[in-house]
Amino acid sequence: MTPHINAPAGAFADVVLMPGDPLRAKYIAETFLENAEQVTNVRNMFGYTGTYKGRRISVMGHGMGIPSCSIYAKELITEYGVKKIIRVGSCGAVRQDVKLREVIIGVGACTDSKVNRIRFKDNDFAAIADFDLTLAAVQAAKAKGINVRVGNLYSADLFYTPDVEMFDVMEKYGILGVEMEAAGIYGVAAEFGAKALTICTVSDHIRTHEQTTAEERQLTFNDMIEIALESVLIGDQQG
């Protein structure tokens, strides 16, 4: 056990899906996993382990922002032997051609956070997803006939940013979605020798002000979840 996870040793599978919302973790476990059991509940950050088509998989919330998700990702990797983390979350779009509810596979993550500079001796660290996880996710999406976008995310430290002009810069550089965790998770995975990927569903559009409801974010976004789960099976087949 750790200060933040009260699961016993061996409670987690080697692959963990991580939404920000612990209630989304509960939804994923109850909807997609068989024989799912809750294995941790410290601070109501729920974690579950079950099987998907016979494959043992865990799901656990990571909270909001890089500090929170980094704690859980680090402890899962170093204390529970987790090898792969797939973040399944929401993001905001800044480009006009990116639409509400589209699925984005984040091959890289820009950020205004300094966490990766701290761990990388104040140099720029290229926060990127694992190639094999990315490839498997793209293949899973194609197999299910789900259109996805593949490209860069932006992990912001501030949800309510005062620098709205930065959205213009993001759009110029082709950023597909703004969220708050991917760069941190990629940094943790690199530091501790694990693999990581972020898959996001567009929950709101910063330009058009369209948005999904809190209930929709908690109980839908199934395409993203199915892509993540199927990608695990594809990854197993490819070794």
Curated annotation (Swiss-Prot):
GO terms for biological process: purine nucleoside catabolic process. A purine D-ribonucleoside binds at H4, E179, M180, E181, S203, D204. The active site is at D204. Pfam families: PNP_UDP_1 (PF01048). GO terms for cellular component: cytosol. GO terms for molecular function: purine-nucleoside phosphorylase activity. InterPro entries: DeoD-type, Nucleoside_phosphorylase_CS, Nucleoside_phosphorylase_d, Nucleoside_phosphorylase_sf. CDD domains: PNP_EcPNPI-like (cd09006). It catalyses: a purine D-ribonucleoside + phosphate = a purine nucleobase + alpha-D-ribose 1-phosphate; a purine 2'-deoxy-D-ribonucleoside + phosphate = a purine nucleobase + 2-deoxy-alpha-D-ribose 1-phosphate. Its EC number is 2.4.2.1. PROSITE patterns: PNP_UDP_1. Signal peptide: none annotated. It is an enzyme of class 2 (transferase). Homohexamer; trimer of homodimers. Belongs to the PNP/UDP phosphorylase family. Catalyzes the reversible phosphorolytic breakdown of the N-glycosidic bond in the beta-(deoxy)ribonucleoside molecules, with the formation of the corresponding free purine bases and pentose-1-phosphate. PANTHER family: PURINE NUCLEOSIDE PHOSPHORYLASE DEOD-TYPE, URIDINE PHOSPHORYLASE. HAMAP family: Pur_nucleosid_phosp (MF_01627). This is Purine nucleoside phosphorylase DeoD-type.
